[in-house]
Amino acid sequence: MSIVLTGVCQAYSGFELRDVSFEVSAGEIVGFLGPNGSGKSTTLRILLGLERPARGTALIEGAPYARLSEPMRTVGSILDAQWIAGGQTVTQYLTWLAIAGGLDRSRIPVLLEQVDLAYAAKRRVSRLSLGMRQRLGLAGALLGDPRYLVLDEPLNGLDPEGIRWFRDLLRQLRDQGRGILLSSHILSEVSAVADRVVMISDGRVTGSGSLSDFEAEGSLEDAFFKHLAPKDR
């Protein structure tokens, strides 16, 4: 089973997502790259059921997100760690997520240790740095022990030590058999962890293949600029 997007289209004033198709299989990290405004976040929102595509399908293990019987056990996500309600403590936020998703709250202390936030368990979210909120967002994404992760710019706000920690954790999660879709503008980090890469520019997929295929063009950075649509150059 896998995440499969087929012919996904969406249109807004001045922007069009056109026939986006790619797959994320279990046990692999797929880097999702593109310039600002290229359609990355819109694609992820459609995948997670936050928007409906005008055409095409976005399926997780054969079903759209809205029809998953246990969504948080199937896919975890980070879209924007800054939105997390600031009035709650770290533990209260994860407890709320667990109750909402019908999940076991006993995993919360273990996850806080895993993301190195146990020391901040009683701290209000409003007092967390962006990097700490990213760690909290990851704990929330892992709360249901999901088979897939969808991560949108999860490295924002992390210091160099935090980025290295996150890189190692992603590899561990992949080696446990999880499929991971990683959207990031930090090309060096995508290059360090991705098995495959999907590039999107001006609303359409401009390249898709193994990391080694793209690096054969010189480097992932070279390939990124080579695959930009004329509008984004």
Where are these regions (language model features)?
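Conserved ABC transporter NBD signature motif
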Residues: 56-71
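Hydrophobic anchor residue at the start of the ABC signature
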Residues: 138
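Conserved ABC ATPase "signature" region
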Residues: 95, 99, 105-120
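Helix-to-loop junction immediately C-terminal to a conserved catalytic motif
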Residues: 48
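ABC ATPase "signature
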Residues: 208-209
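Catalytic Walker B motif of ABC-type/P-loop ATPase nucleotide-binding domains
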Residues: 149-153
